A protein has these predicted regions:
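Acetyl-CoA-dependent GNAT
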Residues: 3, 7-80, 85, 98-99, ...
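Conserved acetyl-CoA-binding loop-helix of GNAT-fold acetyltransferases
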Residues: 84, 90-103, 126-130
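Conserved active-site alpha-helix within GNAT-family acetyltransferase domains
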Residues: 95, 119-137, 143
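Conserved GNAT acetyl-CoA-binding A-motif
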Residues: 105-116
Length: 149
Protein backbone atom coordinates (compact mmCIF):
# COMPACT_ATOMS: atom_id res chain seq x y z
CA UNK A 1 0.00 0.00 0.00
CA UNK A 2 1.44 3.28 -1.13
CA UNK A 3 -1.17 5.94 -0.48
CA UNK A 4 -0.92 9.72 -0.81
CA UNK A 5 -2.89 12.71 0.44
CA UNK A 6 -4.73 15.09 -1.85
CA UNK A 7 -7.65 17.47 -2.12
CA UNK A 8 -11.05 16.18 -3.25
CA UNK A 9 -12.74 17.49 -6.37
CA UNK A 10 -16.44 17.60 -7.19
CA UNK A 11 -16.08 14.45 -9.32
CA UNK A 12 -15.14 12.60 -6.10
CA UNK A 13 -18.52 13.25 -4.44
CA UNK A 14 -19.96 9.77 -5.06
CA UNK A 15 -16.93 8.01 -3.57
CA UNK A 16 -16.91 10.37 -0.58
CA UNK A 17 -20.60 9.58 -0.03
CA UNK A 18 -19.82 5.83 -0.13
CA UNK A 19 -17.16 6.31 2.56
CA UNK A 20 -19.55 8.47 4.60
CA UNK A 21 -22.16 5.69 4.54
CA UNK A 22 -19.50 3.13 5.52
CA UNK A 23 -18.51 5.36 8.47
CA UNK A 24 -22.12 5.69 9.66
CA UNK A 25 -22.69 1.93 9.35
CA UNK A 26 -19.59 1.31 11.47
CA UNK A 27 -20.55 3.82 14.18
CA UNK A 28 -24.23 2.87 14.43
CA UNK A 29 -23.89 -0.88 13.66
CA UNK A 30 -26.65 -0.85 11.07
CA UNK A 31 -27.03 -0.73 7.30
CA UNK A 32 -30.03 1.58 7.69
CA UNK A 33 -28.22 4.90 7.22
CA UNK A 34 -28.53 7.69 4.71
CA UNK A 35 -25.68 9.33 2.87
CA UNK A 36 -25.34 12.97 2.01
CA UNK A 37 -28.27 14.64 0.26
CA UNK A 38 -27.77 16.00 -3.25
CA UNK A 39 -25.72 19.18 -3.07
CA UNK A 40 -24.53 18.70 0.53
CA UNK A 41 -20.89 18.49 -0.57
CA UNK A 42 -20.98 21.36 -3.09
CA UNK A 43 -19.71 23.92 -0.57
CA UNK A 44 -16.43 22.02 -0.35
CA UNK A 45 -15.73 22.56 -4.04
CA UNK A 46 -16.57 26.24 -4.53
CA UNK A 47 -13.11 27.62 -3.71
CA UNK A 48 -13.92 28.95 -0.25
CA UNK A 49 -12.33 27.91 3.04
CA UNK A 50 -14.06 24.54 3.18
CA UNK A 51 -12.44 21.54 1.52
CA UNK A 52 -12.06 17.79 1.80
CA UNK A 53 -8.71 16.13 2.35
CA UNK A 54 -8.47 12.64 0.87
CA UNK A 55 -6.13 9.67 0.99
CA UNK A 56 -5.70 7.92 -2.35
CA UNK A 57 -4.31 4.48 -3.14
CA UNK A 58 -3.92 3.30 -6.73
CA UNK A 59 -6.20 6.07 -7.96
CA UNK A 60 -9.03 5.30 -5.53
CA UNK A 61 -10.07 7.44 -2.56
CA UNK A 62 -9.70 5.31 0.56
CA UNK A 63 -10.33 7.96 3.23
CA UNK A 64 -11.49 11.53 3.68
CA UNK A 65 -11.78 14.33 6.21
CA UNK A 66 -13.96 17.42 5.75
CA UNK A 67 -12.39 20.71 6.86
CA UNK A 68 -14.58 23.72 7.64
CA UNK A 69 -13.20 27.16 8.54
CA UNK A 70 -15.47 29.27 10.76
CA UNK A 71 -15.06 33.03 11.12
CA UNK A 72 -17.49 33.76 13.95
CA UNK A 73 -16.62 35.71 17.12
CA UNK A 74 -13.75 33.29 17.59
CA UNK A 75 -12.18 31.74 14.53
CA UNK A 76 -11.82 27.98 14.52
CA UNK A 77 -11.61 25.02 12.19
CA UNK A 78 -14.17 22.24 12.48
CA UNK A 79 -13.20 18.76 11.30
CA UNK A 80 -16.11 16.65 10.14
CA UNK A 81 -16.74 13.15 8.86
CA UNK A 82 -13.38 11.40 9.11
CA UNK A 83 -13.80 8.09 7.31
CA UNK A 84 -11.20 5.46 6.44
CA UNK A 85 -12.42 2.44 4.49
CA UNK A 86 -12.24 -0.76 6.53
CA UNK A 87 -9.25 -2.51 4.94
CA UNK A 88 -7.09 0.62 5.38
CA UNK A 89 -7.78 1.26 9.06
CA UNK A 90 -5.11 1.21 11.77
CA UNK A 91 -2.18 2.02 9.47
CA UNK A 92 -1.97 5.75 10.17
CA UNK A 93 -4.18 7.24 7.46
CA UNK A 94 -6.60 8.94 9.89
CA UNK A 95 -3.63 10.34 11.80
CA UNK A 96 -2.09 11.75 8.61
CA UNK A 97 -5.39 13.32 7.52
CA UNK A 98 -5.74 15.04 10.90
CA UNK A 99 -2.09 16.17 10.90
CA UNK A 100 -2.60 17.55 7.39
CA UNK A 101 -5.61 19.53 8.65
CA UNK A 102 -3.59 20.79 11.63
CA UNK A 103 -0.83 22.02 9.29
CA UNK A 104 -3.47 23.88 7.27
CA UNK A 105 -4.84 25.46 10.46
CA UNK A 106 -1.36 26.72 11.32
CA UNK A 107 -0.88 28.07 7.78
CA UNK A 108 -4.06 30.15 7.98
CA UNK A 109 -3.19 31.36 11.51
CA UNK A 110 -6.18 29.93 13.33
CA UNK A 111 -5.53 28.45 16.74
CA UNK A 112 -8.52 26.26 17.61
CA UNK A 113 -9.51 23.03 15.96
CA UNK A 114 -12.50 20.95 17.03
CA UNK A 115 -14.86 18.14 16.07
CA UNK A 116 -17.54 15.86 17.46
CA UNK A 117 -17.04 12.18 18.21
CA UNK A 118 -19.74 9.70 19.13
CA UNK A 119 -19.12 8.17 22.56
CA UNK A 120 -19.70 4.74 21.03
CA UNK A 121 -16.83 5.32 18.57
CA UNK A 122 -14.10 4.33 21.02
CA UNK A 123 -11.41 3.76 18.38
CA UNK A 124 -11.80 7.30 17.05
CA UNK A 125 -11.94 8.72 20.57
CA UNK A 126 -8.63 7.03 21.48
CA UNK A 127 -7.04 8.33 18.25
CA UNK A 128 -8.10 11.90 18.99
CA UNK A 129 -6.82 11.71 22.56
CA UNK A 130 -3.50 10.33 21.35
CA UNK A 131 -3.24 13.32 18.99
CA UNK A 132 -3.73 15.76 21.87
CA UNK A 133 -7.44 16.53 21.63
CA UNK A 134 -9.37 17.00 24.84
CA UNK A 135 -13.04 16.83 25.71
CA UNK A 136 -14.38 20.37 25.59
CA UNK A 137 -18.02 19.51 26.18
CA UNK A 138 -20.08 16.40 26.91
CA UNK A 139 -23.12 16.58 24.63
CA UNK A 140 -24.97 13.44 25.62
CA UNK A 141 -24.26 10.78 23.01
CA UNK A 142 -21.13 12.55 21.77
CA UNK A 143 -18.24 14.74 22.84
CA UNK A 144 -17.09 18.03 21.40
CA UNK A 145 -13.30 17.72 21.38
CA UNK A 146 -10.83 20.55 20.90
CA UNK A 147 -7.14 21.25 20.52
CA UNK A 148 -5.26 24.52 20.66
CA UNK A 149 -2.82 24.70 17.74
Amino acid sequence: MSWTLGKAEKKDSNRINELFIEMLQTIYHTDQVDGYSDGDLDRFFDGRDEWISVAIDEGKIIAFLSIEVHHEDEEYVYLDDLSVTKQYRNIGIGTKLIQNAEAYVKDIDIHEICFHVEKSNTAAFRLYQRLGYEIYEDQGSRYLMMKHI
